[in-house]
A protein has these predicted regions:
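C-terminal motif of bacterial Sec signal peptides marking the signal peptidase cleavage site
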Residues: 15-16
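Short, intrinsically disordered, low-complexity terminal segments
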Residues: 10-12, 98
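Generic cytosolic/nucleocytoplasmic N-terminal low-complexity/intrinsically disordered segments
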Residues: 1-2, 47
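N-terminal beta-rich core of secreted/periplasmic extracellular enzymes
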Residues: 21-177
């Protein structure tokens, strides 16, 4: 071999192209406690507070935007709307990692869209998606609505209440909650 440098330079260049090690918090092989410590050590106070902020889903906001007047959109919190904040603002806040959770996300498509937005955030923390379903998934058309918790308790039938909970859970999983 006359000039070994011809082979060494490309190898060094390829070695320099590696993306580097992923942060510890993204390594599922690591213990949860270490991952949590690593993630929180990288977070600013604003990012930590944002993880505790829960907003209503975009489709819920869009329906309010259609039905409320311009004045109502900017001056009150009717239907869980945020005065002066549009769905586009919420989308950007999600991309920026300033929202940690959504409530009233009614479809798997919406949940997936929101998770894609969160994956663009600096730390790529997945969102927590929730919905109030204390007596069935009443927010989604076609789902079963059961009596409230006190009504269920008054049956004195724990097996019935357990079946209600199982059916509610199945109906909740369908749209991605």
């Amino acid at each position: 071999m006359k000039n070994p440098i011809i082979f060494i330079i490309p190898l060094l260049a390829l070695a320099g192209c590696s993306g580097g090690d992923a942060p510890l918090y993204k390594d599922p092989a690591q213990p949860a406690e270490k991952r949590a410590e690593d993630l929180t050590s990288r977070m600013t106070l604003e990012q930590k507070v944002a993880q505790m902020c829960q907003w209503v889903g975009l489709e819920h906001m869009k329906s309010a935007e259609k039905e409320l007047t311009e004045e109502e959109l900017h001056n009150n919190t009717a239907r869980g709307f945020y005065p002066g904040i549009t769905t586009a603002d919420v989308e950007q806040m999600t991309r920026d990692g300033k929202i940690g959770s959504f409530l009233h996300v009614l479809t798997a498509e919406e949940a997936n869209y929101l998770q894609r937005l969160a994956s663009q955030s600096p730390l790529q923390i997945p969102l927590l998606i929730g919905i109030d379903a204390i007596h069935g998934n009443a927010q989604v058309a076609g789902c079963t609505v059961y009596p409230t918790s006190i009504g269920q308790a008054s049956t004195f039938d724990p097996e019935l209440v357990e079946r209600i909970c199982e059916e509610t859970a199945a109906e909740m999983r369908a749209p991605g909650s």
